[in-house]
Amino acid sequence: MVAAVRAPVKPEMVELSPAAMERYSSDADTTAPNSSLSSAASSTGSLARCSSLSRLSFDCSPSAAVAAAATSCSPPRASVLLRPHRSGDVAWAAIRAASTTSAAPLGPRDFKLVRRIGGGDIGTVYLCRLRSSPERESPCMYAMKVVDRRAVARKQKLGRAAAEKRILRQLDHPFLPTLFADFDATPHFSCAVMEFCPGGDLHSLRHRMPSRRFPLPSARFYAAEVLLAIEYLHMMGIVYRDLKPENVLIRADGHIMLTDFDLSLQSTTSPSLDGDTDTDDEASGGASCFPDHLLRFKRRRNAVAAPRPRFVAEPVDARSCSFVGTHEYVAPEVASGGAHGAAVDWWAYGVFLYELIYGRTPFAGATNEATLRNIVRRPLAFPSGSGSCGPADADARDLIARLLAKDPAARLGSRRGAADVKSHPFFKSLNLALLRSSRPPVVPGAGAGAAPLHRSQSCKAAPTTPPPPTTTKPANATARFDLF
């Protein structure tokens, strides 16, 4: 993964031509799936094999740029003010300044591509910066996802690409991507500008841990942030359907960002407040043998100790028969070919937590077919001698076991969603409301004892040390499938 932003060599910038587009299209078709916005594909060897900057450039004439901006699907300039949790971010302020000084919505003329940093099933990701920010002033860096509509159309995945951009426009959460701008570079290329995450992804970070697994406090921290992101998505009626460590990126401040929404399912939700009710005789007006003054004291004590109402928001009519996901993380109802709903995210969350703690997924087989059989038939088992048997470890195993119930109706989270998961004793030591202000286990670029970076410091000049080598899973372990 790219842990640092090095000063790029000035590439040769060329115009987009039909021949160049065709070469880029063929290159996009062969891009390995499941790469993140800060993928290891940005290593020197990968760049040598695919010099994408020789094929894709935004150095167009002013008239062409204005024409492209006029046909852009970028939101109007006023929409850049609708991100309250990013109000103090330097990267967002730079976007806002560029938008207000431009006569047209942000478009291809406003960005300069630096290098290719990754690729996915429906697009290629580039490191980029605003042209209005001089290089000598350490400009803010962004990740631009470029989708070749012709290549995606050949794969019959145009609907997925459109759904992902539609979801990105709705999101406003500290642990989810911010869509800074979206526009068309040419009639065939659609671009989305998002935050660049210099810390890589959780899969690569796990492989740098001792024994290739996270200590329990670190796993709890990352799982809690992912939990809050899923809670927000479900509140918006979005079933994620692609949770795995490769899709959890590390921001400059060490907090996470969930990414890749092309497999997500949109539905409706009905938020409500759910709380336990008192069923004592005295609460219901029944007779009691206690004196009145003792009853008044008991009622006051119960009122103080009574649990607060919990916010519940789960997609209410999200049902799909699509066979989508990554083999090791799909729920039994998906593996068996049945219909599924929001409960698939809680199954994947259990697999995700299992992998963070134990260094592997619980049902992996020698082949993808064996993995799917294990998911449907094999009971959950925990590795022996994998750690302590203290209360914290017992809580982790209990939470995982409840999340990995093969019956979706019995699965933790299937009834009250994240409210049930958040109340589990595993998260008792965390203040989830203040999680964003907590120091993450790993802060990119910060040494021992260093103060945590603020998210806006992704705009600072990064050290020029090369990124550490990463270990990736076998191709069949992370390959996604989508049979409709």
Curated annotation (Swiss-Prot):
Q: What is the lineage of its organism?
A: Eukaryota, Viridiplantae, Streptophyta, Embryophyta, Tracheophyta
In the induction comment, the record states: By auxin.
List the residue ranges of the region (Disordered).
Answer: 445-484
The AGC-kinase C-terminal domain covers 428-484
Might you name a Gene Ontology BP term for this protein?
A: regulation of auxin polar transport
Matching Pfam families: Pkinase
One Gene Ontology cellular component annotation held by this UniProt entry: plasma membrane
Protein keywords: ATP-binding, Auxin signaling pathway, Developmental protein, Kinase, Nucleotide-binding, Serine/threonine-protein kinase, Transferase
What does the entry state regarding organ or tissue expression?
Expressed in the shoot apical meristem at the boundary of the new forming meristems. Expressed in the regions where panicle branches are produced, in developing flower and vascular bundles.
**Its gene?**
PID
Q: Which reaction does it catalyse?
A: L-seryl-[protein] + ATP = O-phospho-L-seryl-[protein] + ADP + H(+); L-threonyl-[protein] + ATP = O-phospho-L-threonyl-[protein] + ADP + H(+)
PANTHER family per the UniProt record, alphabetical: FLIPPASE KINASE 1-RELATED
E.C. code? 2.7.11.1
Q: What residues does the Protein kinase domain cover?
A: 111-427
- Catalytic-site annotation from UniProt: 242
Function, as annotated, reads:
Serine/threonine-protein kinase involved in the regulation of auxin signaling. May control polar auxin transport and probably plays a role in the pattern formation and organogenesis in the rice shoot.
Kindly give any further remark recorded in the entry.
Plants overexpressing PID show variety of development abnormalities, such as delay of adventitious root development, curled growth of shoots and agravitropism.
**Where, by residue number, does ATP bind?**
117-125, 145
The name of this protein is Protein kinase PINOID
Record organism: Oryza sativa subsp. japonica (Rice)
Molecular-function GO term, any one: protein serine kinase activity
The UniProt entry, under PROSITE patterns, shows: PROTEIN_KINASE_DOM (PS50011), PROTEIN_KINASE_ST (PS00108)
Segments of skewed composition (Low complexity): 472-484
Family label? Belongs to the protein kinase superfamily. Ser/Thr protein kinase family.
